[in-house]
Every structure is written in C-alpha cells, then in structure tokens.
Amino acid sequence: MDMKKYAAEAIGTFWLTFAGCGSAVIAAGFPQVGIGLVGVSLAFGLSVVTMAYAIGHISGCHLNPAVTVGLAAGGRFPAGQILPYVIAQVCGAIVAAELLYIIASGAPGFDVTKGFASNGYDAHSPGQYSMMACFLTEVVMTMMFLFIIMGATHGRAPAGFAPLAIGLALVMIHLVSIPVTNTSVNPARSTGPALFVGGWAMAQLWLFWVAPLIGGALGGVIYRWLSEEPTGVVAGAKAA
C-alpha cells in the first residue's frame, strides 16, 4: 500500500471540495461583490490546476472517483488501486465539507438545508431540471472530462500543459451545468456536502455516483479506442 498516494488524493480532494464548494457557499452570493456562477466555475477549475501541479507527480491527482474509474477503463490505471483511491477521495471531501459547515455556520442566518452546494434534480435542481436531464448532463459532462484528461496526459501531448487543459475543462463544465445539477461530475465532491444537508440530498446522491461513473468509464474507453493506445496498464498514471 502506498499511503503517500492515498494521502495526496485525500488532501487534493479536500482542496477541490473546500475551495469549489466554499466559493459557492461563502462567496457566490455575497452582497454586491458576490462571485456568481462564473466565479464558482473558476474556483473549481483553479482548485484542480493548483493541485495538479502540487500532487500530480505523487498520485496522479485524480481527486475524483469518476476520473479514477475512467483512467482504469482507459488502460491508464491499475484496477486494483481503484478502491483505496476512491476511499481517500471521499474521506477528503467529507473533511472539507465538515470544515466548510463549521465556517459557514458562523454567519447569521446560515441554513444548511438550503443546499450547501449540494447536487440535485427535479425540485432540487437550480433550474428544476428533470431527473433524466440531470442524468444525461452528468454522463456527458463526465465523459468529455475524461476524454480531455486522457488526451491532455497522453504521451504525445505537449508536456506541462495538462493541468491547464484539465482545469479549463472543469471551468467549462461548470459554466454549462451549474444551472442543471449544480455540477457534480465527481461523486466524492457530491458526497461531502450531501452528508451535512441530509434528507433530499442523500436521497438523490445515487445519481451523482452512477452518472459520473458511467460517463467516466465511457470517456476512458472511447479515448483508448480513438488513440489506439497500448492495452497494458501503466501503474501510477497521472490524471493531471
């Protein structure tokens, strides 16, 4: 067991969840100077860029169970390492959500039941999109995210630019899908806040595991076929 890789994944996912969800909970609607949808999108993207440069050489900087599964499906990551990576990612997201909850609770009028950056469908979708619309959005967005990750980290891709391409992709994904699902494409990121919201957020959490995992696997398989990469697994392959 390589505990350093798992610790890096936990820390990286903590940062993604704390910075990304924190921007939504604390800064998005701040009177007069709130960062809004664009600011939240940038926060998620920048969290990935910064962590990719910080821990990409340690764990590959997956920060996301769908990325880990997608890389395995694409032949870039050993299947036997999926479970410990996912556990580390979920733990990091939960700790981030707990810290964010403590901080946000210090503001008067804070109500965790209003969403706490949770993902949802139907009445709990920001735009009240249907379950099917939200499911398709998460599948397609995660599929394209993995496609970009696979391409940006390919051996023939320009060296050193993968974190930027991947971070910008996540910004684009959020710009499009925040109104639909509040943007997941990451089961760990969805799990942390949902645990504190409870109720509807936990009841709808299944979609934000199933759809991203399907999308991630599809993205990995499609890029593997398209690029005609070797079928052998490369241990420790990087996501960013």
UniProtKB/Swiss-Prot annotation:
User: InterPro entries of this UniProt entry?
Assistant: Aquaporin-like (IPR023271), Aquaporin_transptr (IPR034294), Aquaporin_Z (IPR023743), MIP (IPR000425), MIP_CS (IPR022357)
**Regions crossing the membrane:** 10-30, 35-55, 82-102, 131-151, 160-180, 194-214
Residues of the site described as Involved in tetramerization or stability of the tetramer = 21
Q: Provide the reaction this enzyme catalyses.
A: H2O(in) = H2O(out)
Pfam families xrefs: MIP
Q: Where is this site: Selectivity filter?
A: 44, 174, 183, 189
Places the protein is found:
Cell inner membrane
The membrane-topology field of this record reads: Multi-pass membrane protein
Q: Which GO terms describe its molecular function?
A: water channel activity
Span(s) of short sequence motif NPA 2: 186-188
Keywords for this protein? Cell inner membrane, Cell membrane, Membrane, Repeat, Transmembrane, Transmembrane helix, Transport
Query: Does the record bear Lyase in its keywords?
Result: no
Domain of life of the organism encoding this protein: Bacteria
User: Which comment does the entry carry about domains?
Assistant: Aquaporins contain two tandem repeats each containing three membrane-spanning domains and a pore-forming loop with the signature motif Asn-Pro-Ala (NPA).
Q: What does this protein do?
A: Channel that permits osmotically driven movement of water in both directions. It is involved in the osmoregulation and in the maintenance of cell turgor during volume expansion in rapidly growing cells. It mediates rapid entry or exit of water in response to abrupt changes in osmolarity.
Note the subunit structure: Homotetramer.
The family line of this record is: Belongs to the MIP/aquaporin (TC 1.A.8) family.
Q: What is this protein called?
A: Aquaporin Z
Origin species: Bradyrhizobium diazoefficiens (strain JCM 10833 / BCRC 13528 / IAM 13628 / NBRC 14792 / USDA 110)
